[in-house]
């Protein structure tokens, strides 16, 4: 039986309404991306405080080998800085909701507790200024990408997470690699870039089942609004700050009065 503390089981399934949130996704923080780290810390200091709540819909980190491995005495200076900045944000009266993604699916309650944040389940319906919004990382709706779905089924499994978190930290990255190798080998066929995107009917069905008016997600790195007869779906931008290539981008979604999303790209 899986430990209830594993991230796959630990996320809150309901939370109080949001009054004025800013939402980000796919920041992919990592030690080898110092410019990205600096940009994120500036965001927490200068942009996020303008809003009542910060919501992260997955992949805040490019990898996360478990709270026990990434926090505490062995924590990197980067992780310490992120925890301190998030804790300062929440201690100043803001709420922070963090959802694990695929890259950081082992992000758990110890991390969010250290930040004063809330770990939330994927997906989760939240009332935003009177509008019912389904928040998700979004990977589960890329249903034509069978290798991705096979990999996701493994690494988000409570049983797999429980077994991996029992291993020494140094062995955990190998387990992710083996899971991806097995998924790729079981589904070796090439698929188009289009088929790696969200399948509208899959997202729409989740929204209907949850009673949500709007879907908001990350994962695909294809920011924009997608409105059709089935669904109103908003895709969050990813972050990429690279001084060498000058390939710099970031962004977020905020809400107008009445819970209408608006996307901001930089």
Segments (PLM) and residue ranges:
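Conserved beta-sheet core of the metallophosphoesterase superfamily
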Residues: 114-122, 132-134, 139, 144-150, ...
């Amino acid at each position: 039986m899986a430990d209830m503390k594993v991230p796959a089981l630990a996320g809150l399934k309901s939370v109080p309404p949001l009054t004025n949130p800013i939402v980000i996704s796919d920041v992919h923080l990592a030690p080898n991306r110092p410019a990205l780290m600096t940009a994120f810390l500036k965001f927490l200091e200068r942009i996020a405080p303008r809003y009542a709540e910060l919501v992260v819909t997955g992949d805040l980190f490019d990898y996360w080998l478990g709270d026990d491995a990434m926090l505490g005495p062995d924590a990197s200076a980067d992780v310490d800085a992120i925890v301190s900045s998030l804790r300062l944000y929440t201690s100043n009266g803001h709420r922070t909701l963090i959802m694990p993604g695929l890259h950081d699916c082992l992000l758990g309650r110890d991390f969010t507790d250290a930040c004063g944040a809330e770990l939330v389940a994927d997906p989760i319906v939240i009332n935003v200024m009177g509008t019912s919004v389904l928040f998700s990382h979004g990977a589960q709706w890329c249903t034509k990408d069978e290798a991705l779905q096979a990999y996701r089924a493994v690494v988000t499994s409570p049983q797999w997470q429980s077994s991996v978190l029992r291993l020494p930290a140094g062995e955990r990255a190998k387990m992710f690699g083996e899971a991806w190798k097995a998924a790729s080998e079981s589904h070796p066929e090439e698929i188009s870039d289009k088929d790696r995107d969200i399948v509208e009917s899959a997202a729409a069905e989740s929204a209907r089942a949850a009673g949500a008016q709007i879907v908001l997600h990350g994962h695909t790195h294809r920011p924009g609004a997608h409105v059709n007869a089935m669904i109103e779906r908003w895709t969050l931008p990813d972050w990429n700050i690279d001084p060498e290539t000058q390939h710099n981008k970031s962004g977020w979604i905020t809400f107008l009065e009445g819970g209408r999303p608006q996307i901001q790209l930089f």
